[in-house]
């Protein structure tokens, strides 16, 4: 059956072509395209256990989307594996490692999934059929909501639990609507797992919302004031956006950890996300080490695209930060304006009370009422300023940081390849020396090592090409998402401004006759 | 550095919208609505020049009164000369029964100058467009303050010219006509100290005098009313100021947001760059409207309240003077009784008592009329300004709405 399928037309693998594919916004078309990668191409096979090479049909230009073989794996997983399946465990058991393990050469090659040997071809085909079916159905059909923040517990051990509701018609989920309770550290844990699996091979993993020790402490301590409710709402909205972005990513959506997060009622506590835990400190140290490395690695960039893009992201980052600062100032001033308008309203009411001309007195009271309503308007507008505009910008500032991180991983990957080449050279020199010195057993050892390092060099090259390809695709997808996001949110924001003006018109139109009535 | 010179048409071209100026004109003059054109005596400030430390006003008079040598003439005056004129009214016993038009506040460009200076210092840290934008803004601010101070000086003169008694004042005529410097050097330290003590005594007196309940219901009511009103106007004026300032800050933020969006738009390579540029344009335009809203609120609300703060103080001063004369009258009565009892200097006491009585009655009579006029003026001024405020708010909100809707139509059409 699978063999009869006509592969969707693919171009020569340039990022733009990939974008065309995604035009339909169909999660599964991309999966389908990847499923049809040629088994003969060296890249995918190396990632997976051998049996998966039954990758279908159709000669496919090797460049496109081959890295998504991992996606295939998960596609199968969604069809076949229940939560209790033993096959899932190897993935899950890895949950503790990502948080702690720095990116070492061994983990640079993705597969934690190597231990998972999946995919009989039949399953594979079947899943592809089902996927294609769904592909013809609704576009990208999954909706996530984060709601109902609830304080659990007391004192410093208290935490907020959020309800995560998923509505979907995707068949990979067992139900079409379900919800679970999650706490903030669960979200961080999810991100941590996804990041450790996908970041270093070039996927742009959406960053989780930031921790805030001050904010949370206030909530824990039970301060029931407006600033802590604001904080909780800000966090809830941020968590919702985080999940929505994550599920939008076709590769991440297939990840079993993500599914477990959304579906399973009990989630093992992600303890390694605590800021001051041992793991946390180790993370900080590693980040610092990374930073140092970044400065010292000088890569021979053969592809101008990467340099260009990096520069673009750098510029974007700068401008977004500036814009964000201005919008934050606007939020602040708008709140001030609201407070001052309220104060003026009260004062005008008092003035109206003491005014002894009746008509003028009434008009002043009306003015006070109008100003009070306008104060409300300002408050609502400040809310919109913040939640729509300001948060969009801060989300993207963090996303761009993730993008930059992915570029850095590529550089590290290159470094690893370089290092392997250098080591290989050294081993060859050793062999030559041994030959001259005529030490047969040492020669054998040297030959073994040479073989070992030749393989590593090949692997390094493949990894590098892979990550470069992935990044190109990811950046294309990211740019598309960014354009869509900004357009949608900014239009919504402008509509909020429209509403404010319409309300203002209503209020002043009501007041005008009152003012004219002063006789 | 010489500031902007206001031409005869009061700088019709310099501002974005000429209506801004004419509204302002109407606004402040409308604070005293009965200052309509009176052929007998018309005064205005036709020109003004700002030099580093002082402002020079050109006071232009048109009159058919025989007191003046010509029918139309102009002189140049500075702020101190206005204060001299005002003080001469205060010190004139004959005018004790009138509300003396409050003196115009001193021209204060310090804040604006400081901002312009800071901008100059920070020139390196911003883009050329931003710098030009901010410079334009600050210059507009400077201009607005300038126009306001001109208007306030003008209103003072108009009030005097409209007052049936004050307009005949000799000092006033000298002020209008004498084309040399009046040499009224500002008060020196000694005089300022004297003033200070005078005011202290007055407020101490005020406490004593206000304790005396007035026989006349009208004045009793006025006193209670004015006391409370004055305080509340003060509060409202301060709060209105803060509100308009916040509004302006928010408008300034729109400016920066527009600039940032512009930068994002020009450096972006995807199709969103047009989007950003359109939104940037929107923010620039909407900012102008928001700044106008803030300026109009300042004019119609804050300035109105500030002016009536000063006028209500002048009215309180009138009441004080009347109370003082009442106290003098009562003291003269007591002195007369004593003199009669002792049968010594009775005639003197009688004359003194009569004078006090006349003075008190004269003040009471004119004060009553003044306070009634004050109320009429006040109600009319509030009405005019509140109506204009509402109309302007509506105009700007509608303008804003249209801008936003047009922009949204374009943006939605594109995507």
Curated annotation (Swiss-Prot), chain A:
Gene3D superfamilies: Arfaptin homology (AH) domain/BAR domain, Phox-like domain
Residue sites binding a 1,2-diacyl-sn-glycero-3-phospho-(1D-myo-inositol-3-phosphate) per the record: 183, 185, 211, 235
PROSITE patterns registered for this protein in UniProt: PX
Residue list for modification Phosphothreonine: 101, 104
Chain ranges of the BAR domain: 299-519
Protein origin, superkingdom: Eukaryota
Record GO biological process: early endosome to Golgi transport; intracellular protein transport; lamellipodium morphogenesis; retrograde transport, endosome to Golgi
Keywords: Acetylation, Cell projection, Endosome, Lipid-binding, Membrane, Phosphoprotein, Protein transport, Transport
Membrane topology: Peripheral membrane protein
Domain PX: 140-269
Modification sites for N6-acetyllysine: 469
Region (Disordered): 1-20, 30-103
GO molecular function: phosphatidylinositol binding
Span list, region Membrane-binding amphipathic helix: 278-295
Location of region: Interaction with RhoG: 260-519
Protein function: Involved in several stages of intracellular trafficking. Interacts with membranes containing phosphatidylinositol 3-phosphate (PtdIns(3P)) or phosphatidylinositol 3,5-bisphosphate (PtdIns(3,5)P2). Acts in part as component of the retromer membrane-deforming SNX-BAR subcomplex. The SNX-BAR retromer mediates retrograde transport of cargo proteins from endosomes to the trans-Golgi network (TGN) and is involved in endosome-to-plasma membrane transport for cargo protein recycling.
Domain-level remarks: The BAR domain is able to sense membrane curvature upon dimerization. Membrane remodeling seems to implicate insertion of a N-terminal amphipathic helix (AH) in the membrane.
Subunit structure comment from the entry: Predominantly forms heterodimers with BAR domain-containing sorting nexins SNX5, SNX6 and SNX32; can self-associate to form homodimers. The heterodimers are proposed to self-assemble into helical arrays on the membrane to stabilize and expand local membrane curvature underlying endosomal tubule formation.
Family that this chain belongs to: Belongs to the sorting nexin family.
Name the UniProt record assigns to this protein: Sorting nexin-2
Organism: Bos taurus (Bovine)
């Amino acid at each position: 059956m699978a063999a009869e399928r006509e592969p969707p037309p693919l171009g020569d693998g340039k990022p733009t072509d990939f974008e065309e594919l995604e035009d339909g916004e169909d999660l599964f078309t991309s999966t389908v395209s990847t499923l049809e990668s040629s088994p003969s191409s060296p890249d995918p096979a190396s990632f997976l256990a051998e049996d998966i090479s039954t990758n279908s049909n159709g000669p496919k230009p090797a460049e496109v989307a081959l890295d998504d073989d991992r996606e295939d794996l998960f596609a199968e997983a969604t069809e076949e594996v229940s939560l209790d399946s033993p096959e899932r465990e190897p993935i899950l058991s890895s949950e503790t490692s990502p948080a702690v393990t720095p990116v070492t050469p061994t983990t640079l090659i993705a597969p934690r999934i190597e231990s998972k040997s999946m995919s009989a071809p039949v399953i594979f085909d079947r899943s592809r059929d089902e996927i294609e079916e769904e592909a013809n159905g609704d576009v990208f059909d999954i909706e996530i909501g984060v709601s109902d923040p609830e304080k659990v517990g007391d004192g410093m051990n208290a935490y907020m639990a959020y309800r995560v509701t998923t509505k979907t018609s995707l068949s990979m989920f067992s139900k079409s609507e379900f919800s679970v309770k999650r706490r903030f550290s669960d979200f961080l844990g999810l991100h941590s797992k996804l990041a450790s699996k996908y970041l270093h091979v070039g996927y742009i993993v959406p960053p989780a919302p930031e921790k805030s020790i001050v904010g949370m402490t206030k909530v824990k301590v039970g301060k029931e004031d407006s600033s802590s409710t604001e904080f909780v709402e800000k966090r809830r909205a941020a968590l919702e956006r985080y999940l929505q972005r994550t599920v939008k990513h076709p590769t991440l959506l297939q990840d079993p950890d993500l599914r477990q997060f959304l579906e399973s009622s009990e989630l093992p506590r992600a303890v390694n996300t605590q800021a001051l835990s041992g793991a946390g400190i180790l993370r900080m140290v590693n980040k610092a080490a990374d930073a140092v490395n970044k400065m010292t690695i000088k890569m021979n960039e053969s592809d101008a695209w990467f340099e260009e893009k990096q520069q673009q992201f750098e510029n974007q980052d700068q401008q977004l930060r500036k814009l964000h600062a201005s919008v934050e100032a606007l939020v602040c001033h708008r709140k001030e304006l609201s407070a001052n308008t309220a104060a003026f309203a009260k004062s005008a009411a008092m003035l109206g009370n003491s005014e002894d001309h009746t008509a003028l007195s009434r008009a002043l009271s009306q003015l006070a009422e109008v100003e009070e309503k306008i104060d409300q308007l300002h408050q609502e507008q400040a809310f919109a300023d913040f939640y729509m505009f300001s948060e969009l910008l801060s989300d993207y500032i963090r996303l761009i940081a993730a993008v930059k991180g992915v570029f850095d991983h590529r550089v590290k990957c290159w470094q690893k390849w370089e290092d392997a080449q250098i080591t290989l050279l050294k081993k060859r020199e050793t062999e030559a020396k041994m030959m001259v010195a005529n030490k047969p057993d040492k020669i054998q050892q040297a030959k073994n090592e040479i073989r070992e390092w030749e393989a590593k060099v090949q692997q390094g090259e493949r990894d590098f090409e892979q990550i470069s390809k992935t990044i190109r695709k990811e950046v294309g997808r990211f740019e598309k998402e960014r354009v869509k996001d900004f357009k949608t949110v900014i239009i919504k924001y402008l509509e909020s401004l429209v509403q404010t003006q319409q309300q203002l018109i209503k209020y002043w139109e009501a007041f005008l006759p009152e003012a004219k009535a002063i006789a | 550095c010489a500031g902007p010179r206001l031409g005869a048409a009061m700088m019709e071209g310099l501002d974005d919208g000429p209506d801004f100026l004419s509204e302002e004109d109407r606004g402040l003059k409308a604070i005293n609505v009965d200052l309509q054109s009176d052929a007998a005596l018309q005064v205005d400030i036709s020109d003004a020049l700002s030099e580093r430390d002082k402002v020079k006003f050109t006071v232009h008079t048109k009159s058919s009164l025989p007191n003046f040598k010509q029918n139309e003439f102009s002189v140049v005056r500075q702020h101190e000369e206005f204060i001299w004129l005002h003080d001469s009214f205060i010190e004139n016993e004959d005018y004790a029964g009138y509300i003396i038009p409050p003196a115009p506040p001193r021209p204060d460009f310090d804040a604006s100058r400081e901002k312009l200076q800071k901008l100059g210092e920070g020139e390196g840290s911003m883009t050329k467009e931003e710098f030009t934008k901010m410079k334009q803004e600050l210059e507009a601010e400077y201009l607005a303050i300038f126009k306001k101070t001109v208007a306030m000086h003008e209103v003072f003169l108009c009030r005097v010219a409209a007052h049936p008694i004050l307009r005949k004042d000799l000092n006033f005529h000298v002020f209008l006509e004498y084309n040399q410097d009046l040499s009224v050097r500002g008060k020196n330290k000694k005089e300022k100290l004297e003033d200070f003590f005078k005011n202290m005594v007055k407020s101490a007196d005020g406490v004593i005098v206000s304790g005396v309940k007035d026989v006349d219901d009208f004045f009793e009511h006025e006193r209670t009313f004015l006391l409370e009103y004055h305080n509340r106007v003060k509060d409202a004026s301060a709060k209105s100021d803060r509100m308009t300032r916040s509004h302006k800050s928010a408008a300034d933020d729109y400016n920066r947001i527009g600039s940032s969006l512009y930068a994002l738009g020009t450096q972006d390579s995807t199709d969103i760059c047009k989007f950003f540029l359109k939104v940037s344009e929107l923010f620039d335009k909407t900012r102008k409207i928001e700044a106008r809203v803030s300026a109009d609120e300042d004019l119609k609300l804050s300035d109105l309240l500030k002016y009536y703060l000063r006028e209500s103080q002048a009215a309180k001063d009138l009441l004080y003077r009347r109370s003082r004369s009442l106290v003098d009258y009562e003291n003269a009565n007591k002195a007369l009784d004593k003199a009669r009892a002792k049968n010594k200097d009775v005639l003197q006491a009688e004359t003194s008592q009569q004078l006090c009585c006349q003075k008190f009655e004269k003040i009471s009579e004119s004060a009553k009329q003044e306070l009634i006029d004050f109320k009429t003026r006040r109600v009319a001024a509030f009405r005019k300004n509140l109506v204009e405020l509402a109309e302007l708010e509506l105009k700007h909100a509608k303008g804003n709405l249209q801008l936003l809707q047009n922009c949204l139509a374009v943006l939605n059409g594109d995507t």
